[in-house]
Curated annotation (Swiss-Prot):
GO biological processes: tetrahydrobiopterin biosynthetic process
Family in the record: Belongs to the pterin-4-alpha-carbinolamine dehydratase family.
Protein name, per record: Putative pterin-4-alpha-carbinolamine dehydratase
Organism: Rhizobium etli (strain ATCC 51251 / DSM 11541 / JCM 21823 / NBRC 15573 / CFN 42)
Catalytic class of the enzyme: lyase
Keyword set includes Lyase: yes
EC number, as in UniProt: 4.2.1.96
Length: 101
């Protein structure tokens, strides 16, 4: 099933509930940098996020160095952002919160 690209107003409404996520200038992707206390916590976050991404069949672009994980989300097939991006972002927030207490 193809996800429909969200209009900018819908994107901004979704983004309002996600602290620290930034919208790129073209409104085609969102990104965030997560900082953890060490590599194990960062990798644990990535592992949990990867399981969710696989369940959603929606995969992030990400980069990890030690305790930092940079994430960018968009839906290539839709040419921008869809509800899948925000579902994955919310799941990532929950995974991060379990490690950032």
């Amino acid at each position: 099933m193809k996800s429909e690209r969200l209009e900018r107003t819908a994107v901004e409404a979704e983004l309002a509930g996600l602290a620290g996520w930034a919208l790129n200038d073209a409104a085609s992707s969102i990104s965030k940098t997560f900082k953890f206390s060490n590599f194990i916590e960062a990798f644990g976050f990535m592992t949990e996020a990867a399981i969710t991404a696989e369940k959603l069949n929606h995969h992030p672009e990400w980069f990890n160095v030690y305790s930092r994980v940079d994430v960018t989300l968009n839906t290539h097939d839709a040419g921008g952002l869809t509800e899948l991006d925000f579902k994955l972002a919310r799941a990532m927030e929950k995974a991060a919160a379990r490690r950032l207490r």
